[in-house]
Amino acid sequence: MEPTEKLCKKMQGQEAGDKPRTAALETEGPLQDSALPIQDDQDKQSSLPRASLGKRPLSKTSEELMDAGTCRVHKAPTAAACGPQSEEEGCSPPERKAESLKPSISAVPGQATAGSLNSHEGDLKKESLEVTCQFRKKTRTLYRSDQLEELERIFQEDHYPDSDKRHEISQMVGVTPQRIMVWFQNRRAKWRKVEKLNEKETKNGPAAPSADSSQHRSAPELLDPMPTDLEPGPVPPENILDVFPEPPMLLTSEQTLTPFQNNEGAERVAVTPPLLSPPPIRRANLPLPLGPVQTPQVLPPMRDVPGSDSIYKDKAYVSWGTSIASPPTYSNLEDLGSQDYQASSQLGSFQLSQAPHLPLFPSLQSQFPYLPPFPYPIPSSMPFLPPEDSLFSFPFGFSGDSSQDYCPGPPPGQILLQPPAENMGTGPWSGHCLPEPPFPRPHYPQALGQPLGAEGYFPNLLPTPYALTMSKQSSLGLNGLLEGTRVETGSSLSKMSDEQTSSSLEQPALEEVRDKNKNSHAAGAKE
């Protein structure tokens, strides 16, 4: 109450300064007048709702002032005035809170209505979405294996069933007609996709194999001309390189039988024919004949001789059968002297005699005067020189049969085979290797024991006294000679393949043959 008393004293001092103190007996008018400004001040400080509350204590204070004195009156109203003010001040925070709550409460319903509207709209949207989702959502129908089998069977019968048939299928399968229709739609889509893929494969399939077949079409054609009934068969190029390392023995693209042209471009294909030939022959150092020679057929395998590489590099060879190689002309005939035959010249030497039926070799007589002796008869149409091997297989037997016999020969030498100009007959290798033999039919001996005459065999290669005496010899003496030599030399030398052993047996065999020839000549002269 102290602050209220102080306020009352101040107010009393102000009133005393303004107006003189009156007597104790004053009417209610001035008291009411003094109370009115206080009430006005209080009304200014307080709000409108407080006005009704402030009037009530003023009425009380007026009654109290009328009953009490001036001090009391002054004190009472102040106290009363202060009391209500304090009460008002004490009550102002809750009132303010109420006032602050009132507009908030008044605003809450609006906000609540707006929120409720928004929430209601959201609920409606959710419901609408749920409704639409329910319409869009499709449940997958799960079919059993028996149902799928039945549907597949019906689909193979009819791809487009009508409504009546769909109803029947639905009753059979146990699924609604709508689901049956959907299943058939999906099945038709799958069927169309498979059909398109098959069409693409059929279109692209024949195109690629046709290109491949056109590219590789020449390979089977090359194999058609090759003989299929021959036992040896074609030799691969790798084996040819290993066995015959020199280039003349290989067939190149220029030497093929028929150059095939491929569809994409013209390119020659090297075809390796089967190398079918008689037993291998050593290649020698003497040149080939200089005359025109018929084209042979097949290249025979020839073994390398040391010292002959410088002469026969990039040269072709004449052989039996059909071949592309042609006999080359040699300009170094003078260089090939008799140095290779000095070792064999000790056995005997003679000069070639001009034969009337060999006009192609007149120059060889002067260029090659020294040749080793050869004691056996050979067909006259073939200039036959001794081979390098000590054992050489003749294409005919000594008894006239087609078996092969081996005869001795000097170490260095060469075999020159000249195909005749006559028609070719059936030869000893017709059933083994070659289709055609190199020997003519009229020169085959019925028996080699016949006397040497017009049908003699190489009389020009024999020494002159031998040729003269043997032309007059009887068939019995020659038969005995040839049979004896065949028994002795053929049996002993046919089993030997090594060159050292054969060269050691070479000279004694020839000496025995000479002795027997002399004995036969002596017997013929005595008769």
Curated annotation (Swiss-Prot):
Residues 194-203, 511-527 have a biased composition (Basic and acidic residues). Residues 1-126, 194-245, 271-306, 488-527 are annotated as: Disordered. GO terms for molecular function: DNA-binding transcription activator activity, RNA polymerase II-specific; DNA-binding transcription factor activity; RNA polymerase II cis-regulatory region sequence-specific DNA binding; sequence-specific DNA binding. InterPro entries: HD (IPR001356), Homeodomain-like_sf (IPR009057), NOBOX (IPR042988). Its main location: nucleus. One of its GO terms (biological process) is ovarian follicle development. It is found in: Nucleus. Keywords: Developmental protein, Differentiation, DNA-binding, Homeobox, Nucleus, Oogenesis, Transcription, Transcription regulation. Residues 136-195 bind DNA. Specifically expressed in ovaries and testes. In ovaries, expressed in oocytes from primordial through antral follicles but not in granulosa cells, theca cells and corpora lutea. It comes from the Eukaryota. Disruption phenotype: Male mice are fertile and show no obvious abnormality. Female mice lacking Nobox have normal gross anatomy and histology, but are infertile with atrophic ovaries that lack oocytes at 6 weeks of age. Residues 488-506 have a biased composition (Polar residues). One of its GO terms (cellular component) is transcription regulator complex. Transcription factor which plays an essential role in postnatal follicle development. Binds preferentially to the DNA sequences 5'-TAATTG-3', 5'-TAGTTG-3' and 5'-TAATTA-3'. Directly regulates the transcription of POU5F1 and GDF9 during early folliculogenesis. This is Homeobox protein NOBOX. It comes from Mus musculus. The gene is Nobox.
